[in-house]
Amino acid sequence: MKITTPHGTLEGDNIEAILKEHGFDCLRGADLSDADLRGADLRDANLRDANLSHANHVKLSIAKISILPNEGDIIGWKKAWTDNEMPPTPVIVKLLIPADAQRSNATGRKCRASTARVLDLQDKQGNSLPPDTTAYSGYDTDFTYKKGETIHVEDFDTNRWKECAPGIHFFITRIEAVEY
């Protein structure tokens, strides 16, 4: 198998052998168009900017790394911060991602949504904070989280492979948000 990347051509018996020899980032920007991905284990592979058009078994490979359900509401968790003290205190935000929200995850565990309802603000131990608590995004301090409010991101990026693109970032397990 040969794979063309921005850094040259990689060769190996199969895609797993190439990943083993060159590392998980070797596929970044790779041309995988028309590739046979049957049975390929792409967990942890960096496919950012990779061309997967017409690749064999792409839908199955994507399904294996997709962690979000395609339908129904889901609960998401994210870490945010209070700013009423220094250093800021971490806050765990419990979100309801509605069924009609745009949602995405790339190849990792971090997810994004276009809209969410703030169900609760908690300390790291899981205790609910007072209802008037405001939490702030660690990325954009103008983006706030208040219990009961519905929040939106107008410029949600629909490209699922852009993990850190615009969106409400969250995890599907609480412990991942706590440890982030």
Language-model features: locations:
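Intrinsic low-complexity/IDR segments
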Residues: M1-D34, R38, R43, R48-Y180
